[in-house]
Amino acid sequence: MSRRHKAEKREINPDPKFGDLVVTKFMNAIMLDGKKSVAENIVYGAFDAVQGKSKQEPLSVFHSALDNIAPHVEVRSRRVGGATYQVPVDVRPERRQALAIRWLIAAARKRNETTMIDRLSGELLDASNNRGSAVKKREDTHKMADANRAFSHYRW
């Protein structure tokens, strides 16, 4: 880690359809090999599919899904006198959002539907209803932190 300069945060533009920065971050995370237009088609197609399946506003479904996936606490490894403890720590808001996006995409990629649009829309709907493997990942993270609450005094 550099001691001289802190890396500057890059300015990102909101997406053209909804004007939302979180959707842009989501698109950038979906994108593979710099193919932004493909990522846009996937995200907007999934949003259209969500609207078709649930008759709800896709942006509100997306934000509620992210809120249901985002972890509040996680465990970090801390070495104390030859033993490594899993210490529960609170998650910063930026990291909460990043983890939620990452877990949502990973869960969507693991699903069995044929196209990524179907997988993503299904996972978004499941997550907004507190179901699905991304929400399970959040629950597992919280259980791990709860099980290691005894080591919370090793926080830094």
UniProtKB/Swiss-Prot annotation:
One of its GO terms (biological process) is translation. Keywords: Ribonucleoprotein, Ribosomal protein, RNA-binding, rRNA-binding, tRNA-binding. InterPro entries: Ribosomal_uS7, Ribosomal_uS7_bac/org-type, Ribosomal_uS7_CS, Ribosomal_uS7_dom, Ribosomal_uS7_dom_sf. GO terms for molecular function: rRNA binding; structural constituent of ribosome; tRNA binding. It holds the Pfam family Ribosomal_S7. Belongs to the universal ribosomal protein uS7 family. Part of the 30S ribosomal subunit. Contacts proteins S9 and S11. One of the primary rRNA binding proteins, it binds directly to 16S rRNA where it nucleates assembly of the head domain of the 30S subunit. Is located at the subunit interface close to the decoding center, probably blocks exit of the E-site tRNA. HAMAP family: Ribosomal_uS7_B. NCBIfam families: rpsG_bact (TIGR01029). This is Small ribosomal subunit protein uS7. It comes from Rhizobium etli (strain ATCC 51251 / DSM 11541 / JCM 21823 / NBRC 15573 / CFN 42).
